[in-house]
Each structure stands twice: as C-alpha cells, then as structure tokens.
Amino acid sequence: MRPPGRRDVPSARPALPLLLLLLSPLLLGAPHGVGASSGAPAELRVRVRLPDGQVTEESLQADSDADSISLDLRKPDGTLISFIADFKKDVKIFRALILGELEKGQSQFQALCFVTRLYHNEIIPSEAMAKLRQKNPRAVRQAEEVRGLEQLHMDIAVNFSQGGLLSPHLRNVCAEATDAIYTRQEDAQFWTERGVDSSVFEPLLKELEQVELPRCGQVGDRGKPCICHYSLSLAWYPCMLKYCHSRDRPAPYKCGIRSCRKSYRFDFYVPQRQLCLWDEDP
C-alpha cells in the first residue's frame, strides 16, 4: 500500500426556537413508508448559518433500510464536506473535497477521508431522520447546542481495496481519496475485535517517527514529510430526539429534535508538505 497522499482528479448563543421539524409519521404512529417511501433515501434540505456568519445549504439523507445517514454541505471556499453515519457497522466517515490552488502547483482538488467509530448517541436514528419534515424551508437554521471540539490523531491508513469490509459506503464516498483514508489505532482495534479483517488497516508510521516529525506549517520544503492538520465542522445536524409530556398520554412521546454543531480537528502524516498546503502556522 502506498503512503497516503493526494490523488489527482479533473460565536454567539444560538437563537431559539430553532427548527420546527414535524416528525409527523413518527409522532402519529404512521405505518412505515408514510412520508418517505420504503427503500428510497429521504432527503431534507436545510439552510444553515456557519460559525463565520455565512449561510449555506445542507442536504441530509436517511436510508432506514441501510440504517445510515448522510450529510453534505459546501463551504464558502468551495470545499465540499460529506459525512456518513453507518449504524450497522458502527462507522462514521468524513470526506473533504478541497479545491486546489493552481498557482501553488496543486491539482484541481484534493480528497481526504477520515473514518472513526460511531457511537449511536451522537446522532438521531436513521428511521427518525427519514421522517423529519420542516415547516419553513427558507428559514436559516442555527444549531441549538455547540458541542466541544474533538481532536483526533489519525495514525492508521485504511486500505481502500479492502474498505468494503469496514463499511459498504467507504468505497463510494472515498473513491477520490484512495491513498488518503485515515483512522485511529483504537478504532481499528474496536472493529477488528468485531470481526473486520486486519488487512483493512496499516500503520502509517511508528509512534516514535510521528513524534519527531514537525507540523506541516513549520516546514518550508514542499517535498518533506510532516504532520498535517485539517479541521471541519458539521454546522447543523439532529443530535437528539425531544420528548414531550401530555395529560392525554401516560408516557413521554417524541415531539421534535435537538440540533447540534460539532467541529473536528484531524492530524495525520503526509509524505510531502505539498499535500497539506492549507496548514499554515498561525
């Protein structure tokens, strides 16, 4: 397996209330398929406000049959961020398609994939997501809860040719990042203990070698190896179900969602500084 690298291919407090999303089929006990056809992913488009104040559109899709959720958003600089939650495999996948700067010798765009363990309390179930509706699609949404920054040290490469063993979504989502798919040792260990073949994973470097490498922002020679940092944010996603009480019902019932924003910072090895030109020293 080649070292991961680039594959060339052509805050203020959030306002309340947030999104009045009708969970109509879910709340009213409608049969499966009412509001979203069985077997076809249900899509929700939401206008969201980014941390810098700019507005973009998110597309959220849920496939209750595959038990997965996907989110796509385009940043103002043109970067496309995609997120997949695969509940069946306990896997979440982040992909960034970063537009290149031709004047710096970069290709049209660069793709990165980060794969980590999914905890089921991070996001609402796919069946609930598939039944979300919104009353005012033109409204600009802002997350009710800002969750803390998560910093992740990605020290394992994922073998793209074997990636389907980890998640069936990986080979499609990370097709442009075949040599730049990263995960963590602790997550790889969790998946191998659950039966994923160890051939899916390969250490990037020995721990001592990574400690000795400088941050890419401190390296002037674009041909030198270094530790790259990449940050991304999920600006708005349904992280929890809300429950309401009623005199007419003996038990609490689902009546909406709570939305969250969460940021991630990944650090990982690159064989050349040229593959991490966005990472500049402050």
Curated annotation (Swiss-Prot):
InterPro entries xref list: Oaf, Oaf_C, OAF_N
Organism of derivation: Rattus norvegicus (Rat)
Protein name (database record): Out at first protein homolog
Gene that this sequence comes from: Oaf
UniProt keyword ATP-binding present: no
Membership in a protein family: Belongs to the OAF family.
Region forming the signal peptide: 1-29
Keywords: Signal
Pfam families attached to this UniProt entry: OAF_C, OAF_N
